[in-house]
Amino acid sequence: MESNQKCGATQIVNEFCESIEGIVFRKGSEEYKQNVNKRWNIDVVNTPLLIVYPKNIQDVVKAVNFSRECQLDFAVIAGAHGFKSTCDNGLLLNISSMKNIKVDEASKTVVVETGCTLGDLDKETSKFGLGIPSGHVSHTGLGGLTLGGGIGHLSRSLGLTSDNLIGCTLVNYKGEIEKVTDQSNKELIYAIRGAGSNFGVITDFTFKLHPVKDVYLGTFVYPHATSKEPLTLLGEYASSKDVPNELSCAISITPEGVVVMAIYNGTEEQGKPYIEKIASFGVPVVSKISMIPYVQLQCLIDNKVPHGLKYYQRGPFIKEALNADMIEIILDAYNKHPTKSCAILLTHLGGKVREPVEDDFSSFAHRNSEYQIIFASIIPSDQDKPSIKQWTADVHTKLMPYCFGDYSNTTDGTQPIEIIYGKHTNKLIQLKTKYDPLNFFKNNTNIKPIQN
């Protein structure tokens, strides 16, 4: 096998760069400097030797083979939200250059390349009145979201993003191209639905589509000081048997106040009784109710979480209905944030997410949760980071009686993998050992293979 030093030789690098149909930026070039930190979270060390923007799957194969043969650190980036999509003196594959989308209206499926954002996909599928359940922010990368599970506004009514994945194209650590479906390789697609970044470079996904056009949205804003009572009422109601899967609630504790978004995936007539019930909780200072396009819903908080800042976050799961004690802990913690540059976000789960699936269908471990909660902070300066990390740890500790697990798409990466992958951990270790014994794909929420 070639050494890292040998692959640093100009001739070998030149030959590789010339073989790529896409674009390659070398460390030290002006283009490299302009592109190396084009990412959502810049609180990372990212110093690759090469940045490769592939034009096609053959470029991906060449990048994998070159990195493996030269023993280079290898990482993949797409939407640039991932905390782990970085490498040191290795090869960074920026797959955001691959954005083709093909909708099959008759079969209600879509084949989408991994470089697409959620917004890219929504824009195309909405032309047909169709869509998939995805996340909360349109500039999130579709690839990373899907491979970690995929939680968002429509999870209760349509399941996780990865639940709607029916196939994909993968380049493995040997540089081989595989078409992966339940029929062709059931154990591998099981692993991809929740831990997929560990097993290869996914170059495209095939999803089943659902009729998705407009949603009935109620937005209610409460002052921090008076929000405990309406949130307690909401917590009790949202977890009751009266609430259908089509209704979900997103709660955001922000500097502007406590924002409740009650989302009904259906018609105004169907959703009105549920949204009006939530509107009756407390006295909101803002109350807006209307039908809006789903694509608009997915963009509502885009400007609150822009690219190019330093972020820190954790994302555990809540195992029961929101109650007064839990809400008091959350509100008190928000008020004690050291820099006030934070938001606490709760996504309503249950519904389709909780419906039983076969153990070999998906490696997502936290289906029995009521909510996912994210403690998200902007880091104003490097000096603030220790206090922000301590604040996050403290609020997480206080919520431990109600919380479990962590979400691979929002974890800080310091937790044991058992916290992320739960009951699936041992099986995933076995599959990692089988499909990536060298741990070539390690810049992720990493599952280490068994070493002989």
UniProtKB/Swiss-Prot annotation:
The modification Pros-8alpha-FAD histidine is found at H81. The keyword Cell cycle does not apply. Its EC number is 1.-.-.-. The keyword Oxidoreductase applies. InterPro entries: BBE, FAD-bd_PCMH, FAD-bd_PCMH-like_sf, FAD-bd_PCMH_sub1, FAD-bd_PCMH_sub2, FAD-linked_Oxidoreductase, Oxid_FAD_bind_N. Residues 44-212 form the FAD-binding PCMH-type domain. It is an enzyme of class 1 (oxidoreductase). Keywords: FAD, Flavoprotein, Oxidoreductase. It comes from the Eukaryota. One of its GO terms (molecular function) is oxidoreductase activity. Belongs to the oxygen-dependent FAD-linked oxidoreductase family. This is FAD-linked oxidoreductase DDB_G0289697. It comes from Dictyostelium discoideum.
